[in-house]
Amino acid sequence: MELQHAIIHGDLDRLRKLEHQILEHANHVYEDAGNGNDNYENFSIYWIAIKEDKELALEMFMTFINTCQTALGNFFHAYMEVLAYPGLVGAVCSGNEAIVDILKTFVDEDAYMDIVSTYN
């Protein structure tokens, strides 16, 4: 998938041109939530958040989030309830506090502390 290729290779310019694939991915994982496919490695947001280059990760993350927020409107928070956990796992593993600070607002305190104790 072109989206994963852009994320893995840190191609921010390409990611910005893949809005339709970002939304397809967000829709897919949202619709599939709770069907046993909750492995965080299946989420693009995880692969963005775990990048070693924290500045690039934040730029890619903001591109991903802004695309979703613009297109999803009132449904954005419902989607973030599904996307936040795998994104937090990646951000905690990579120590990207900027992404952690944004994503932890979408999960309850117990879920956040579970991620920190498990992956930190």
What is the predicted role of each segment?
Residues 2-5, 106:
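Ankyrin-repeat-protein effector appendages
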Residues 9, 52, 101, 117-120:
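Serine/threonine-rich, low-complexity intrinsically disordered segments
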Residues 16-25, 59-76, 101-113:
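Ankyrin repeat domain, specifically the short helix-to-loop turn at the C-terminus of the second helix
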Residues 1-3, 27-48, 74-90, 113-120:
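Ankyrin-repeat boundary/"N-cap" motif
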Residues 87, 96-99:
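Long, mid-chain structured domain cores
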Residues 10, 52-56, 95:
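Ankyrin-repeat intra-repeat helix-capping/turn positions
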